[in-house]
Amino acid sequence: MPARAAGAGVELSRLSAFKPDLYHRAWSSIPHPTLPLIATAHEKSVTVFSLSTLSAHSNLTGGHTRSVRCAVWKPNLPSGKLCLVTASFDSTAGLWRWEGDVPLEEGTKKGESTEIDVTRRRNNNDSDKDNDDDWEFTLVLEGHENEIKSAAFSPSGQYLATCSRDKSIWIWEDVGANEGDDEWETVAVLTEHDGDVKCVAWCPDVPGRNISSYSPDVLASASYDDTIRIWREDGDGEWACVAVLEGHSSTVWGVQWEPKVDNTKFPRLISWSADKTIRVWTLEQDDPEASLSQPGAVQSPFKSGLGGIPNTMRRTLKEEWRCSAVLPSVHTRDIYSASWSKNGRVASTGSDGSILVYEECAPSNPSTTPADLEEGDSNVIVKPGEAKWKVLGKVSDGHGPYEINHITWCSRYDAGVEQRGVEEMLVTTGDDGIVQAWQLKESIEL
């Protein structure tokens, strides 16, 4: 039964699993940012599924000698173009481009489906070779010494970050004159973490990211050393760690930025850990900076972010981040994955096989503090009036006895939804090789 909070909650029910079953451990499933496609990493390959039919669209095989840990979509490509980067345990990242002639029809109205004709691409008689003919493996990125655990594109697609068991983060830049030239250069190798780097995530291109005090490209990383680090580019091509976020007591498996914020606040960050907690992190922004938006304000030549700081001063520059919330502790083992939806809800899953959905709600009294914080947790600093979190729903043993490795929110395009591309669903990926879609229904206790 789903958990309830404050008389309301959500019920999670299974939609159809994506077909075909993969029959081997699957690591993650990443939705395309604008199209009804989702890429699942498993074994030495990637299966791209259609979100319209919940069936396979195409396969990417033959590029790696060991398991593919994740696959990420390059954003902002011209219509009809697809590009994926795969991160593998063979210590390389591969770049793939779709060279097929499948028609892509962009929706023109809010909620209108973005269609992809997948019926021509796959039927029960197709061979794997037929299904990957239209994906071209165009480039191998080499440099890491051990398994690559995660990869992520910056919002513009100019930068790609990869991280590895070798404790390093590599930042690659697309320096090709035209899209498809596939010319990439290493612009930074970051080695400050003391353990495996499990995850990298770029701050999304939301209004709050572009406050004048900050450089636009911001990267977060999570590590086996129990910390999160924040990285920025200084305007001269140098990348620096500007903050170390401490509070978790075990491996930090991942981080994700808040996908939708108002115009004045820098996006928050969530992290999840082997310590069975999910934490929310907030950047402490200087009030004087906010005053610069007032008429007649004068911009100081020395910003509180990296831009504008002389080289001799950059080493001492630090940002102040605080843990502003800990979500209710329900998981009984490692939390492997969490996802923040565009409507503000958070979903999580992990080693215990449970799926949790949380929601943030403002306290009734602005002077109160959240009641769901870990007792005696001195790392949590809550300011008056900040919201608390509650559990909206729970499913136990979502993939039976198997661990669930990944969870993500994505838009629904299947035939069972009225507003295609508007309503969200959850997708979980597990050790059983199943990619499972979940529907959320609002419920109210009378």
UniProtKB/Swiss-Prot annotation:
One GO term describing the cellular component: cytosolic [4Fe-4S] assembly targeting complex
Biological process per Gene Ontology, one example term: iron-sulfur cluster assembly
InterPro entries in alphabetical order: CIAO1/Cia1 (IPR028608), G-protein_beta_WD-40_rep (IPR020472), WD40/YVTN_repeat-like_dom_sf (IPR015943), WD40_repeat_dom_sf (IPR036322), WD40_rpt (IPR001680)
Entry keyword set: Repeat, WD repeat
Disordered as annotated region, ranges: 106-133
PROSITE patterns from the UniProt entry: WD_REPEATS_2, WD_REPEATS_REGION
Signal peptide, first to last residue: none
Basic and acidic residues bias spans: 106-128
WD repeats: 17-59, 63-106, 143-182, 192-241, 247-291, 330-368, 398-446
Keyword Cytoplasm: no
Xref: Gene3D superfamilies: YVTN repeat-like/Quinoprotein amine dehydrogenase
A family per Pfam: WD40
Record bears the keyword Repeat: yes
Homology family: Belongs to the WD repeat CIA1 family.
Function of the molecule: Essential component of the cytosolic iron-sulfur (Fe/S) protein assembly machinery. Required for the maturation of extramitochondrial Fe/S proteins.
UniProt name for this protein: Probable cytosolic iron-sulfur protein assembly protein 1
Species: Pyricularia oryzae (strain 70-15 / ATCC MYA-4617 / FGSC 8958)
